[in-house]
Amino acid sequence: EELDLKVTCYRISVAVGRDEDGFANNFSGYYNFCKFIVLRDRMQNGFKAVKEIEMWVPKKATVNIACIDWMVDLMVKISEKNESAGEVFHISNPDPPQSSWLMEKSLKVLGKLGICVDGIKIFTYDRLKKDIIKTPESPIEKTFSYYQDYAESELRFDNANVKKVLGYMPKHPK
């Protein structure tokens, strides 16, 4: 027997901690990505206690992250509207931060976890063209390469359905 059910799909951004204090229940998502950067560098550089992190990104690359509480609140508002049934909603930050800003803020979080670094060095594609990058060899490097697309992309997700159902696009907290 076929049921006439409409399913609503939410495609969320990379979730980070709460807006007010950055709290996260676990570190399996974005923060894990940050730990991989540090671990990779430490394994390659003799476990130096403090060093710069090197990351290859486009000059103005953005990262589609959003605070978990903002995304949940937005999904609740959307679900309260009858016209949301059967639609797909991209729950994404309408003004995503640049990678360099995000990494600087992330280093503070990692510092609270006992992972110390001394700043961040962002390399752009201009420099990448001049240098040769080796193929990832270690398991940590291979795992890190899985996340490289997130660091390099400048994707923007379409929030059109959110705007259509709510009549506006809620601002993400800064």
Describe every region a protein language model picked out:
Residues 1-15, 70-73, 79-82, 90-97, ...:
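4′-phosphopantetheine-dependent carrier domains
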Residues 2-63, 68-73, 77, 106:
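NAD(P)-dependent short-chain dehydrogenase/reductase
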Residues 7, 86, 152:
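Active-site lining segments that contact anionic ligands and/or coordinate catalytic metals
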Residues 20-22, 101-102, 167:
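Short conserved micro-motifs at the rims of enzyme active sites and ligand-binding pockets
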Residues 39-55, 123-169:
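A hydrophobic C-terminal alpha-helical subdomain
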Residues 59, 90, 150:
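Conserved short-loop catalytic and cofactor-binding motifs
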Residues 73-146:
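Mid/C-terminal beta-alpha module of Rossmann-like enzyme folds, strongest
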